[in-house]
C-alpha cells in the first residue's frame, strides 16, 4: 500500500492510495466518516437565579432560549481535540470523569451581548478551545446573564453527529484517458488543461495518464475516440475536517484504526 498526497492543509486533504481493493477503499471511507474520535460537549449545567457582577449589579440568568436548545448548540461546536485523552468508558476513573477523559468548560457573560463560541473558556485543558470563536450561541438582553459549566468527552460519529470530524469524504478510481487525435478534434485544447507530467503523446494518440491536476476533463466522457481505463487498485480520496483534528491527524488515525481492525480479524480467523 502506498499513499501519495496531492493537497494538504489543516482542514483539507486529497491523496491517492495504491494497492488496495474496492472494499478496503470503502472501509477507509467509512472509517473517516464515523470512526474518528473527537471532543464534544456532553453535559451542561446551568446556574439559575440571580447573578451579580463585580460591582454588585444584579442580572437574571433566564435565557431567551430553552436550556435544551442552548445545550444542543454547545454540543455541536467543534473543539480542538487531543487524541491522548481516554474514552470515558475506558478510563481508569471508571467513567466518573477525570482529567484523563473529561475536559471542563465554562461560560460567564452578562448582557446585553451575543454569546459566541469564543466565550467558552477551557478550564481543565486550556489548549482545547473551540475551533472557531465566532459561532453564535444565544443573544442576551439587558439585565440577562449566562453562567454555565460544561463537560466534553471523546466520542465517534457512530454515537452522534456532534462527534463527526470529517465531511465530504469521497473517492474515485484512478483514471487514464487514451484519445485518438483523428476522432477527437479538440484534443489540443484539452492538452492545454493538463501538466506535461501526465501527458504521453505520439503521432496518432495522446494519453492523459492521470486526470488529477487537469482542469476539467468532463468532455472526454461523452466524446468519440476516447478510451477510459479505471484502475480498481488505485483510488483518489478527498475530505475536509471541522478543525477539531488536522487532516493529517485524521488520515493517520483512520489508517492505524483500519490496520488494528484487520489485524484483529486475521487473529480471529486463525483461531
UniProtKB/Swiss-Prot annotation:
<dbReference type="GO" id="GO:0006351">
    <property type="term" value="P:DNA-templated transcription"/>
</dbReference>
<keyword id="KW-0240">DNA-directed RNA polymerase</keyword>
<dbReference type="InterPro" id="IPR036643">
    <property type="entry name" value="RNApol_insert_sf"/>
</dbReference>
<dbReference type="InterPro" id="IPR036603">
    <property type="entry name" value="RBP11-like"/>
</dbReference>
<dbReference type="Pfam" id="PF01000">
    <property type="entry name" value="RNA_pol_A_bac"/>
</dbReference>
<dbReference type="InterPro" id="IPR022842">
    <property type="entry name" value="RNAP_Rpo3/Rpb3/RPAC1"/>
</dbReference>
<comment type="function">
    <text>DNA-dependent RNA polymerase (RNAP) catalyzes the transcription of DNA into RNA using the four ribonucleoside triphosphates as substrates.</text>
</comment>
<dbReference type="InterPro" id="IPR050518">
    <property type="entry name" value="Rpo3/RPB3_RNA_Pol_subunit"/>
</dbReference>
<dbReference type="InterPro" id="IPR011263">
    <property type="entry name" value="DNA-dir_RNA_pol_RpoA/D/Rpb3"/>
</dbReference>
<dbReference type="GO" id="GO:0003899">
    <property type="term" value="F:DNA-directed RNA polymerase activity"/>
</dbReference>
<keyword id="KW-0548">Nucleotidyltransferase</keyword>
<dbReference type="GO" id="GO:0046983">
    <property type="term" value="F:protein dimerization activity"/>
</dbReference>
<dbReference type="InterPro" id="IPR011262">
    <property type="entry name" value="DNA-dir_RNA_pol_insert"/>
</dbReference>
<keyword id="KW-0808">Transferase</keyword>
<comment type="subunit">
    <text>Part of the RNA polymerase complex.</text>
</comment>
<keyword id="KW-0963">Cytoplasm</keyword>
<comment type="similarity">
    <text>Belongs to the archaeal Rpo3/eukaryotic RPB3 RNA polymerase subunit family.</text>
</comment>
<protein>
    <recommendedName>
        <fullName>DNA-directed RNA polymerase subunit Rpo3</fullName>
        <ecNumber>2.7.7.6</ecNumber>
    </recommendedName>
</protein>
<dbReference type="GO" id="GO:0003677">
    <property type="term" value="F:DNA binding"/>
</dbReference>
<dbReference type="Pfam" id="PF01193">
    <property type="entry name" value="RNA_pol_L"/>
</dbReference>
<dbReference type="GO" id="GO:0005737">
    <property type="term" value="C:cytoplasm"/>
</dbReference>
<keyword id="KW-0804">Transcription</keyword>
<dbReference type="GO" id="GO:0000428">
    <property type="term" value="C:DNA-directed RNA polymerase complex"/>
</dbReference>
Amino acid at each position: 500500500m502506498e499513499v501519495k498526497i496531492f493537497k494538504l492543509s489543516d482542514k483539507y486533504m486529497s491523496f491517492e492510495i495504491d494497492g488496495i481493493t474496492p472494499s478496503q477503499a470503502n472501509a477507509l471511507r467509512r472509517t473517516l466518516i464515523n470512526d474518528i474520535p473527537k471532543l464534544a460537549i456532553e453535559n451542561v449545567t446551568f446556574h439559575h437565579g440571580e447573578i451579580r457582577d463585580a460591582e454588585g449589579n444584579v442580572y437574571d440568568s433566564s435565557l431567551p432560549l430553552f436550556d435544551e436548545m442552548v445545550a444542543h448548540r454547545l454540543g455541536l461546536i467543534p473543539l480542538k481535540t487531543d487524541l491522548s485523552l481516554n474514552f470515558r468508558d475506558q478510563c481508569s476513573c471508571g467513567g466518573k470523569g477525570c482529567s484523563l477523559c473529561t475536559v471542563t468548560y465554562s461560560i460567564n457573560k452578562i448582557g446585553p451581548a451575543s454569546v459566541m463560541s469564543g466565550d467558552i473558556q477551557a478550564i481543565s485543558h486550556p489548549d482545547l478551545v473551540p475551533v472557531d470563536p465566532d459561532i453564535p450561541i444565544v443573544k442576551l438582553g439587558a439585565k440577562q446573564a449566562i453562567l454555565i459549566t460544561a463537560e466534553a468527552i471523546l466520542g465517534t460519529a457512530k454515537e452522534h453527529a456532534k462527534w463527526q470530524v470529517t465531511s465530504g469524504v469521497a473517492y474515485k478510481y484512478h483514471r487514464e484517458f487514451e484519445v485518438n487525435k483523428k476522432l477527437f478534434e479538440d484534443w489540443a485544447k484539452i492538452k492545454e488543461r493538463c501538466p506535461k507530467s501526465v501527458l504521453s503523446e505520439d503521432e496518432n494518440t495522446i494519453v492523459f495518464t492521470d486526470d488529477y491536476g487537469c482542469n476539467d476533463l468532463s468532455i472526454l466522457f461523452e466524446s468519440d475516440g476516447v478510451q477510459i481505463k479505471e484502475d480498481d487498485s488505485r483510488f483518489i480520496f478527498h475530505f475536509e475536517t471541522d478543525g477539531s483534528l488536522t487532516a493529517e491527524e485524521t488520515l493517520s488515525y483512520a489508517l492505524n484504526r483500519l490496520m488494528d481492525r484487520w489485524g484483529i480479524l486475521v487473529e480471529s480467523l486463525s483461531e
